[in-house]
Amino acid sequence: IYITEPMKYKNLFFDLDDTIWAFSRNARDTFEEVYQKYSFDRYFDSFDHYYTLYQRRNTELWLEYGEGKVTKEELNRQRFFYPLQAVGVEDEALAERFSEDFFAIIPTKSGLMPHAKEVLEYLAPQYNLYILSNGFRELQSRKMRSAGVDRYFKKIILSEDLGVLKPWPEIFHFALSATQSELRESLMIGDSWEADMTGAHGVGTVSYTHLTL
């Protein structure tokens, strides 16, 4: 990682999923594990068939969640039920059991993005490090502990705390206020151009960068 004008910044806000914690890999591993447990090959041509259906609906639902059109509970219910419905399996109880197992397992996964821990080890003595994430509270802290990175961060700020997702400006202002950070001394680091970069830039004087560790 290279930060221009390093003395300018005191506060580094990190996204968590796929910036530090390897969400895509950890989630896929968890899905495969639970898929096998419930013998879903009897319903789907392959795991990839199931996962493609899930991801399609999950993406749609997160957009609706960000717009306030569905609740967190409805998002979770629909995204696990949809793949089964798509192949004619109207078993909502099965989808709920799958969901419960998924959420029990995924925060125990410890996979990190390449060099994430080394970067945090380097930055922690020099900057105030914070997490700013759209993830759910019951998962994010546990994921960080499982991966051994919780100790690097002074505070975790979640969009769920405010009810507003990144990239809306309100969540960035909320994070700055919650950490008593000055705009001109703060930098947002994340993997999503829209949620992390555009959102931070839209606040005005918050500096930002696009970083994949």
Residue ranges and their predicted role:
Residues 166-197:
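Conserved Lys-Pro-Asp/Glu-containing loop-to-beta segment of HAD-superfamily phosphomonoesterases
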Residues 209-213:
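Conserved small/polar residues in nucleotide/adenosyl-binding loops
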Residues 46, 92-93, 151-155, 183-186:
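Short acidic capping loops at alpha-helix termini that bridge into adjacent secondary structure
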